[in-house]
């Protein structure tokens, strides 16, 4: 007790570190038992004092920070502004993410700093404050989450979730915030489930690789070592890391201090020796590691070093491989449960700022900086060297030096206020270790077409793919528009650039009742579907054999045609969509009330785009004389017929082509044999029998009666019964062969009596034609049915007079019309309608043609449009047909590999490749197209085949206007000389994207100069022109051309041959408002005129005199180096990958991010998303070594150096991840694993070797030994195997088969005749033998051969020096022949100087 006076009294606060130090010293001095007694006393003292102070923790002790509300509001405001910038396309997704994270991180940090002063001011003895800030329990981060805000969280992949948790745990979390918390918090629900399995599998693979590694010898006799130096050129190795690396190792060489030896070779290093080495600051120390052990499948005691359990050299028979695998895998399993209670809360760093010392004007040298973008997307200047910035105040000048690689955020001569941020210093080099390069994919928010506003290069390795690299900052645009993917059964109403009407045909998948099947399905290949009309009359369908369906009335207006011969007075315009165009029948109102779609009257057939080819049918007329109310069979006498097949009638369905011909008559008679047809479902109850004879008005079913009498024939057809009633006379002739000779023939009147006698046994003359048909009932005698025949006389087709007068400029190009009759049904085919619908047999067509004499004419097509002319209050509608010289061609903006260079309109490119054939298969018609007005564009893929329809609907347009202050000056008004009696033709203006408007939308307002004048004498005057329908007036040019919409009075120069629009160049406006060019892309919030509206982002589609129409588009900013997916003009769907950025982000300090990294390194996956040319560097190094040393040495040394370097860097990478988590793993465990995955080489084809096959994987040591034994050069190169591949490339096939791919491994082993020597643990466990470790280890070990110790003076070598020298020693004989017989230090030194420049340190 007397010694107490001499004890030193410390009055200090003890934290955790000090307690640890105290305990360790107590144990050293007093031992374990006494120390535990002391610690008990300390614990009791603490509890006593806590009770005396009455510290308790209640929820009221958690005081929230008052400034939190406005701090969060401020951050939200900044986030909102950032979101708007992103929407406008000013920043891209990465910059937005970075800035968002930094905004919230700064807010969270500021709150954390406010916390301590807040406690101190309000309640200094708050228990939370006392506990956390004294370091007794908890830390600032946890208290911050309790009373500040939880802030940003990391997800299981370690990615930042940019939605911060604004609440703290005192206030409670919302549902979304709680779910985000589940990702992070300790034992997080999401995390534990996902991660534990990963860590377990990692451990399994690691153990699999190294399970056979056992300590089998004391010394392998190696002379190699790895040098470890406490100081390095780059940076000092910390003492802790240095001592950890050395303790427990064995020296590979003696250590000298001057002349005196401090330690000798093969001595194990303890803590005392390490301390002496650190104190003496010796040079590099060479140590033995598992890498230097000369064995292949085991390890020796000296290369392994001390056992981690009892601190002595490892025992023989120790299973060090399994220990190593578990040492690396186990921390992963533990650390998945995030040891710290901070719970995945993000920690990062913000950049350092330079602020202005006072108010003043900025001055700096602009030549030393160049403009750039900061990582948040703000404009800035980057200075490459030290930059002096002068701030000129009123009375003082400040000089601020900005370090290199910093961002200057202000401009020259800008006025700054005091404390304003003027520069941002780039984070120092030390933070670079915590950065990693990652990929970020940006996905499209909407569907539409992709465009970009700059050139894009193909990525070199993907020359033929759709991956492009951006050379400079630009916008990617997604132009909105709905799309429908085409399928086998699709509906070809539309071609490229067509307009769709609101009422255009929408075909939907419908179930078709059996009543709506028609008899002539087989003939036409169509299947009819119920339209809106037939729904009103249940069970009936309108029988139109070649129509695809009905449409609503588009508009009603009185229409007349040009030619008076085909004029039909008082008719209404009812239009119907057909596959190849519009159908506009002219019919009287009375008929319209009787029937929905009359069969008489003139129908004009106009293609969808108003363009006719040669021999197109312009109009047709259904003559009432050729109409029948009943079904029947058509026949004709074949004087000659050829079928007209139109392009559009070719129907393709799953590769089958059905051609529906229209038979053009050269005959004068058509015969129609009537019959009554009914189709019933199979379940119907029929009251008549097959082959029975019934009278008129006989009841067939409960509610159907026959209209004619005659013979009943029934036939089963696809799910129903077809019942036919043949009227006529029945005869029973005597001789069967005479019947068969005359069966199925038409017999004319006035024929010979004898012939008739045989057939009919009647002698009186016939007044009409008859049809003889033989009927054979099943059991009864055959008889002949003589059926009445209706005959029709048909007039031949005639050519109408040419409508146009001879044109002085081009005499040949004139319109001609031909009247053609054709029969709608084939010869002998059944033409039938159900119940009482009527049937048209013959149709009269008006065929359009021109310049038949001149084959070389360039006019391929004509355009049709309607013109309305008013004379004296009477309105006449004319169909106007324009000749178009040459093809209309659409050029895309850029001839891109994907794009459709030039698509001609005359059929070849488009018609043949258009998959939108009209097909009505058994499943009905696919899906409806859009039912709203829009422009259709067909997008082409690489092979110029159509893939997708894109539909621009009205919802994708914005109409902005009016722009009052856009003025046009000096427009030249050119007048056309107009005679009083002449009519200037009026051209329908072009619609969006160079298309013709459909009939419902055509208009005509401007006068055009054309070459064809049509003279209509004394018919009307020019002033009375008016547009029939009120629609937008607009003009459109190609994306680069200029746009100019003239006044209503001015004239437009139009070249009708190629449809390029030439506008008179307008002078610019007096105001500085720009003239918008068509196809131009505008970002949102841009004002095109001073007082104009703010535009939405999009592409200028239509420019009018006082308004502009913009197709809405979404801009995405992309910076150089980004990868763009997809082609220019390609279609993207929502969620498709649009662009990939590669950026650096700071690593999150958490093991859950570490585990994937460890796995990546061990599985040897590429760490960076884009290889940093590492492979090329290794290849170049190998090539240069080969060049210097020749072939044999080059491969040998190149492979060895590659392996040594890669081993060291792998160990360092894995250690870095674990150390960042505070997990201490001894290097030797990692080295054993890394040795296994780097111990194989790949035999290459460069040298012809008779020992191994090219591409074979062999052990490095085996390759060296074989080369030495056979004195033959084996060429090989180093290869890194991942742990999975290494497990499947061992010497034991039983071990491989028990890991993965059992069948494949065993089959290969059987084919190769492999032998398993059962050296490892696993194969013995599988077969139930004694495992060769511990007590089962066979002590019969051969004495290692004593190597001649070659004493050489050690160089102060770095790693490469030591390694290279050892390589040379191993291959002495070869080396002698290569260089010289004497091996001097100098020669070695000189030889190595050139190669050994890079240094490496190892820890």
UniProtKB/Swiss-Prot annotation:
GO BP terms in the entry: DNA-templated transcription
Requisite cofactors: Zn(2+)
Cofactor note: Binds 1 Zn(2+) ion per subunit.
Record's keyword terms, sorted: Chloroplast, DNA-directed RNA polymerase, Metal-binding, Nucleotidyltransferase, Plastid, Transcription, Transferase, Zinc
Annotated EC: 2.7.7.6
EC class (word): transferase
Subcellular location field: Plastid, Chloroplast
Binding site for Zn(2+): 220, 293, 300, 303
Record's signal peptide: none
MF terms in GO: DNA binding; DNA-directed RNA polymerase activity; zinc ion binding
Annotated Gene Ontology cellular component terms: chloroplast; DNA-directed RNA polymerase complex; mitochondrion
Catalytic activity field: RNA(n) + a ribonucleoside 5'-triphosphate = RNA(n+1) + diphosphate
Quaternary structure, from the entry: In plastids the minimal PEP RNA polymerase catalytic core is composed of four subunits: alpha, beta, beta', and beta''. When a (nuclear-encoded) sigma factor is associated with the core the holoenzyme is formed, which can initiate transcription.
Role noted for this protein: DNA-dependent RNA polymerase catalyzes the transcription of DNA into RNA using the four ribonucleoside triphosphates as substrates.
NCBIfam families named among the record's database cross-references: rpoC2_cyan
Family: Belongs to the RNA polymerase beta' chain family. RpoC2 subfamily.
Name the record gives this protein: DNA-directed RNA polymerase subunit beta''
Gene that specifies this protein: rpoC2
